[in-house]
Amino acid sequence: MPSTKPASSTISRSAAIASPVPETDILTLQDVSVRFPRRPEAVLSDVSVRLAPGEQLIVFGASGSGKSTLLQTITGVIPHSVVASLGGSVRMGGTLSIETSVVELSRLVGVVAQDPASSVCLPDVEQELALPLENRGVDPALISARIDRALDAVQARMLRHRSTGQLSGGEGQRVALAATLIAEPAVLLLDEPTSMLDAAGLGAVRRAIRSAVDTYRPAVVLVEHRIDEFTGTAGIAGLPPRALVLGEAGTVIADGPTVDVLAQHGRSLNQNGCWLPLETELLAVTGCAGGLGEPGVRAGLRSLGEPAGALGRRQDFGRIVLTATDVVIDRGVGAPNGTATPVLAGVSLDLRGGEIVALLGGNGTGKTSLLLTLAGLHRPSVGTVTGARPGMIFQNAEHQFVEHTVRGEIRHGLPSLSDDELQAILHRHRLTHLADQSPYRLSGGEKRRLSVAAMLAHDRPVLLADEPTFGLDRRDTIATLAALGQAADAGRSILFSSHDLRTVATLADRVIVLADRTVIADGPVFEVLRWDEVLKQAGLELPPLIRHLLKEFDSDARIRRVLGQLDAAVGAPT
């Protein structure tokens, strides 16, 4: 989202605070601190940020650094709807948010969240976009033209008469963006807007955001983990021109031009587990600037691949522990068997002990439906699933929470779990300081860590995980992959879905690809990732790093070693 507007503050936080507040700023946070009940440490500490109309800001920070809390504070959800102690002041358009209702604030600030389905209220797109205007009393004669303008801005005019229930992930997110911007908010908050999308949907949403911002010119605050996918081929230039970095204590570490912030803080951000543009990560690890096109960077990556060693995991997997045979999964809810168009048909697969299998496919190809069927939570209309009873990690972590505290969630169903074992699990997943918190009060990344920790605590021979690294920062992604790897090394079978092909290349032994309502490929991970025809049919797009490594190395062991060395540059969880 390029912009010619200069950043309104410098790298020096103290200088930013000392500067007078211009009357033209649309958003002003001054010395803001947020504390939640039963959580002694502040989630945000003395945060001061000013945002001018049309200015664009990206927020970097590890999981738990307060990014979600910052967005909730800007919208007024904190403290109006979420119980929290708010210090300092938040002004939106010159008005103190503490003195303004969330309803009034919603006229000034719009939010596009991770899951487009969570914000959809009405059955068709036209009604969905008309609703915000009707709520504001807009002349009905003007609404149709406003709908066309909003859909044009997100490049989705063809969706106007579609059912919202039939939209793909990318289409749904573009409609959510249009429904947010149609009311012309002064501030647009983008909370990981591409995190649940496949490559095709992500590209469409990326283009839609840029087009919509150019049309409506709101101030923008972006939180995004999938930095490289979000920017596409533009790299750092595709990010908002101003960056704010939050430390683990919720303090402002840096605030200034994105290029300068990444140049000065890239190494520490990488060590602290933030997802970064690839060129910044490679500079931090190899010491060479310029990205994959520079000889020094390529030489640095080659050196990381030496010596090749072993792949790190044994290849002689154990016995078959779960089998699906000729499975058909129907789509229609309440439709008689055989009358609904199937989500998947003719699916047969085996899972072996000690093997890690990645399940790939675009949005809507049936990955979640297949996992739920294998878990025994959905019954196939045709075919059979036999074998061990699996454990399931849901994409939405809250769907598996049943207790009131983090420690209770891990203990659930494990009466013999000792206190020492519980403490070890809490420590391994960086949850010790949250042991007495409600699972529902955690950040998105913390909820994901808890869902993984709770299911790994059960000794199920088969573990199914729906996007297990969704919403995690780099450090917690690495820790989660390590935990899944250890479970496989102990003989458990792992099947996980993912949109992240770097994660797949790092962890998986085998890949199953879904497209056109069936399995189109099933084979060793690097063999499948080299099948261009399969990737194209499935709508999958290799990240630039993985594409480069597949061309650079004939040895799969060296590819995995490079990926491991890049992960090793990230600091271990504390």
What does each model-identified segment do?
Residues 184, 459:
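Conserved catalytic motifs of ABC-family nucleotide-binding domains
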Residues 266-323, 535-574:
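ABC ATPase nucleotide-binding domains
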Residues 180-181, 455-456:
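ABC ATPase C-loop
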Residues 188-191, 463-466:
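Catalytic Walker B motif of ABC-type/P-loop ATPase nucleotide-binding domains
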Residues 223-225, 498-499:
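H-loop/switch region of ABC-family ATPase nucleotide-binding domains
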Residues 75, 375:
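Helix-to-loop junction immediately C-terminal to a conserved catalytic motif
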Residues 141-159, 419-434:
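Conserved ABC ATPase "signature" region
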Residues 249-274, 518-542:
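Conserved beta-strand-loop-alpha-helix hinge in the C-terminal portion
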